[in-house]
Amino acid sequence: MRKMLLAAALSVTAMTAHADYQCSVTPRDDVIVSPQTVQVKGENGNLVITPDGNVMYNGKQYSLNAAQREQAKDYQAELRSTLPWIDEGAKSRVEKARIALDKIIVQEMGESSKMRSRLTKLDAQLKEQMNRIIETRSDGLTFHYKAIDQVRAEGQQLVNQAMGGILQDSINEMGAKAVLKS
C-alpha cells in the first residue's frame, strides 16, 4: 500500500513540477539576438537595434536623439541578457524536478528502477521542446513566440505519457518485489 501511495505521489509531484509558470506578458513578437543586432519581428513590424543604439523600423533607418539612443541601447542590452536568463531558468526548473523525482525513485524503488530511464527521457524531451521556444544558434538565439502554445500542449502530452509509463513501471516493480518476498 505504501508503494502505491508513492506511485500516486510521484505522479502528482511530477505534474506539479511541470505546472506552467504564468507570465503576465503575452509575447507577440519573435526576438532574434545576434552579435550585430537585436531584431524584434512580429505583428507590428520589424525593429532592428544595433548595440550602439541605431534603430531601423520596417527597413527605414531612424535618427534618434541622445535619450532615445540610450533607450534603444538599454532595450537591446536587456533582451540580450534576459532571454538567456529565461532559457536557463526554465531548463533549471525541469532539471531540479527531475533530480527530486529521481531521488525519490532511487530511495523507494532502487537504482535499477526502469522509472529512472523514463524520467531521464522525459527531461530530455521537455528540454528539447523548450529549445523550440528559445533556440540557441551559433550566432546568438531566437525567441519564437508562436511556438509557446504548441510546446505547452506537446509538453503536457509528453508528461502525461511519461507518467502513465512510470505508473505502470511502479506497479510492475512493486509486484515483482512482492513476489520475491513471498
What are these regions (language model features)?
Residues 18-182:
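Terminal leader/tail segments of proteins
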Residues 1-19:
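Gram-negative bacterial Sec-dependent N-terminal signal peptides
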